[in-house]
């Protein structure tokens, strides 16, 4: 029977089932329900909530609770959840009365399915092994404490969330848990962070039918999505209770929006970090690095970030808080100032000289510490309680920031390892902390940098868990820049993680340029030499030219890329968009992996000379060929000076910028708009100051562009800018490049005919609109 409420902004309704289980239901907002189930009278604490990873400041939701015999219901207007107090069966329907979830049931360990799934899990993952790497990385063997001897844990302490599936329903997300598919119905996904297997699992999936589930636990769990029973989705938890969120919307983008609302909106890197981030060889000293910087500028290959691998440290792989520079190879300061504080940037030494050339410096780090100390001290401080007196590991890095370092590469060593012998300060074991550590590491990095500098920095980490997207960027780890990395990008994007990348060009020689093509169209781009030499000036002439051309293309697209990043921070939409996210009604793309949409306008082919073009008109970005597709796969050989296929969607409006050697944070004075007229289309360009956190409180400018093609007339409109940010230009020049394939007869600016335009051999019309005021509505009419 209905028992009562837990008092908060939106109450947790408590229901006691006839089978002895206690259920809690909270309507977080209209479209999000949080559900807890336990065999006890009290619910266990969520560490994700305790440490500020999950949203708790929900606004009050209008809701109505009803009881009808054994049926308990809670309605929020758009959705209603019903629980049968006799059986525990839960169902959800929308306002129209359509059932979205027909049967969701919590199964205790007494149910035979727990033992069945445990056996399947243990058999499936029996051969999973992490190679030890000379003591640098590799899971501990459990010598010092109890370690699960089976993947499933103890079946007698397990439980299952069991959901009946609908015919034709497809599932996406799960983080980097599958490197065979992006559509996961029929798969089992392992939610446990493991080096070179599942670095960023996210216990979240969304259905093609407009709903999603986030399993709010940090313990090992498994998503059996129709693998054991094709009509049932079972979440196997290695504990006897559950805490999960159900989210609903009209589409998968709606579900991503709600999921990232719960677990944190995606972090936006500083604008310059969306340029080329390059890691030189780990044997290079400061003079080699400075020479690299000079050659990047001389060879006109744009680059913004250089980082140092472990060679910068006095002690190689120094995990301590006492680390120092290797002053024999690097001079960020005079060596005799090594023990003098506070630290500062010397403009005439290594870091300052890089800054003078427009480069930002990052440092490689390895970490192994107890992150619960910092978190518990933060809680104690808020409550006015004493501190632990123990060191906060991240604090020692402020000295390097003061010297001019602007970010850190967080190596998987050894946070990604299991630490079954650890006695965590908060009293938890590694069973609760291992997955959580992967969020707390970038969280504490971001919080330290924000507090110390007030600016966004470049930092990224190989591993993660739900919520990691809010605290920084990621790479696919030590898995190269090939197909494994491609699966990670697609699956992470479908899990609300926007800032993803990989070790671009870390592939076999014959795929290296194809990997560069891939990397150019990633949210952020890193090329990691490590033991190699990936500098563009070490390649042959043909490859140098391809390298340069791709980097120049990348930099020209920075307004488009950065706009997509800000959009992602507001909505949860990734920059790399798997095809089913953009074309959900096209069954041909359900599990498509050799291509994706880059933002809303580019279709990028990866490691293949075949590409599927959904229904519509597409333009070959390299040749200008226009293809009217009925939804079909085509084969094309890309030009000799390119390394992959690239198509532009009908109606596209793409903001670009003139050639630059580095980005900085200053907004572009001139925006080049590449326009592909087709019917009615539009595009909103988002901008901010490029480095502060003001975007989080709305300091974003939005410029809406609209194009209308009607017969022989194309009408293009630049609307007044909405919103503002520090440093926003009051006026701007727009260069229009209209790709209609026909020579205009007349062009009008407002009602005035203009003659200062050109029509080139590439069948593109170009005109310049100078000094356009941000408050003006500007309209160009082209007649053919």
What residues fall within each predicted segment?
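A low-complexity, Ser/Thr/Gly/Pro-enriched, surface-exposed linker/loop concept
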Residues: 26-74, 109-114
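Solvent-exposed beta-strand/loop surfaces of large extracellular or lumenal domains
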Residues: 47-63, 620-641, 746-770
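Bacterial Sec-dependent N-terminal signal peptides
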Residues: 1-12
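Conserved, mostly hydrophobic/aromatic
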Residues: 25, 78, 204, 296, ...
